[in-house]
C-alpha cells in the first residue's frame, strides 16, 4: 500500500509504501575532496529513505569521496537481495551518468546481472525527474514569500562550460517550462562561466525583485561562495558554513535580491530518489499536482 499526503498546489508527498524486501537502493553522488558538505544531501536523503523501511538496504557511494563507486561493488551481500536500484544524485544526464558511473559500477546497460544472480538496475538521475519544475518554483516561493511574482525575475543558475554542458541544457529546459506558466515577469537561465553570466544580473533584469536558485545538487563552493560573490553579496552575509541558508534577502543596486541554497538540498529530493527507482520498477508512487 502506498500512502501519500496531498499538498494543495504543491503536489503529493510520499509517506510510506509496501516494503521491497528483496531490493536495495544505491544512491550515487559526486562528492568532493575539498568540501565535505558536497556529500551531505546524498547522505541525508539516504538516511531519510532508510528510515521509511521501503528497501531492504539503502547505501550511498561517491566519485570523489569514500565509500567509492568501486567500494559499492562489495555492498549488498545478503542473498535475499535480488535487485539493486542505482539512482544517480546528479542534476542532469552527462559524462558522469553515461560514462563514469557505468564504468565504475561495471554496468553493461539498464540492467546488469551479477555472477550471484543479483540484478543491478540503472535508473535516471534525479534532475531528470518531472517534478524538478515544481521543486524550483517551490524553492523560489519559499525564499521570497509574499513577493509579487509579476514584479520578479527568476534566475536559474547552472555552471555552464563545455565540460558541463548538460547542466546548462537542463537549466535552459527548466526555464522554458517555467516561462510557459507565465507566473514571473521574466525567467532566465544564467551561468557562472558562459553568457548570459550570473554576474551580469543587474543588466539582465529589469524588475524590483530578483530571485536566484542554483540548479545544483549540493551547497558546494560554487553555490555557497562563488555565486554569491558573482552576485555581489557582501562577505559575511552568508551563514557560518555550507548547508545553511544564506540571509535570503539582499538589497543591491536598488533591488531586492533573494538567493537560495542549492536545489538538491531540499529534503523532498528523497521522494524524487524513491520515485526514480520505482519508475524503473514500474511502480507509480509520486505525482505532481
Report residues per predicted region.
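Active-site-proximal alpha-helix that buttresses catalytic centers in soluble enzyme cores
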Residues: 15-289
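Short, positively charged and aromatic/hydrophobic N-terminal segments
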Residues: 3, 12-16
Amino acid at each position: 500500500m502506498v500512502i501519500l499526503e496531498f499538498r494543495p498546489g504543491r503536489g503529493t508527498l510520499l509517506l510510506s509504501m509496501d516494503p521491497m524486501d528483496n531490493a536495495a537502493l544505491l544512491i550515487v553522488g559526486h562528492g568532493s575532496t575539498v568540501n565535505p558538505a558536497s556529500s551531505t544531501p546524498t547522505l541525508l536523503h539516504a538516511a531519510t529513505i532508510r528510515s521509511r523501511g521501503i528497501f531492504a538496504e539503502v547505501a550511498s557511494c561517491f566519485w570523489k569521496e569514500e565509500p567509492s563507486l568501486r567500494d559499492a561493488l562489495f555492498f549488498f551481500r545478503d542473498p535475499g537481495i535480488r535487485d539493486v536500484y542505482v539512482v544517480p544524485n546528479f542534476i542532469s544526464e552527462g559524462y558522469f551518468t553515461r560514462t563514469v558511473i557505468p564504468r565504475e559500477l561495471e554496468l553493461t546497460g539498464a540492467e546488469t546481472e551479477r555472477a550471484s544472480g543479483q540484478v543491478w538496475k540503472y535508473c535516471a538521475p534525479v534532475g531528470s525527474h518531472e517534478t524538478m519544475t515544481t521543486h524550483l518554483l517551490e524553492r523560489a516561493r519559499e525564499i521570497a514569500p509574499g513577493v509579487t511574482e509579476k514584479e520578479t525575475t527568476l534566475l536559474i543558475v547552472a555552471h555552464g562550460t563545455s565540460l558541463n554542458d548538460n547542466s546548462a541544457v537542463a537549466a535552459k529546459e527548466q526555464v522554458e517550462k517555467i516561462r510557459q506558466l507565465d507566473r514571473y515577469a521574466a525567467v532566465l537561465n544564467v551561468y557562472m562561466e558562459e553568457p548570459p553570466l550570473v554576474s551580469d544580473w543587474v543588466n539582465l533584469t529589469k524588475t524590483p525583485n530578483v530571485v536566484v536558485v542554483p540548479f545544483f545538487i549540493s551547497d558546494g563552493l560554487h553555490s555557497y561562495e562563488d555565486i554569491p560573490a558573482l552576485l555581489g553579496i557582501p562577505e559575511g552575509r552568508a551563514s557560518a558554513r555550507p548547508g545553511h541558508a544564506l540571509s535570503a534577502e539582499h538589497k543591491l543596486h536598488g533591488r531586492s535580491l533573494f538567493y537560495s541554497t542549492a536545489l538538491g538540498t531540499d529534503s523532498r529530493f528523497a521522494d524524487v530518489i524513491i520515485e526514480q527507482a520505482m519508475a524503473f520498477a514500474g511502480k507509480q508512487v509520486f505525482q505532481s499536482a
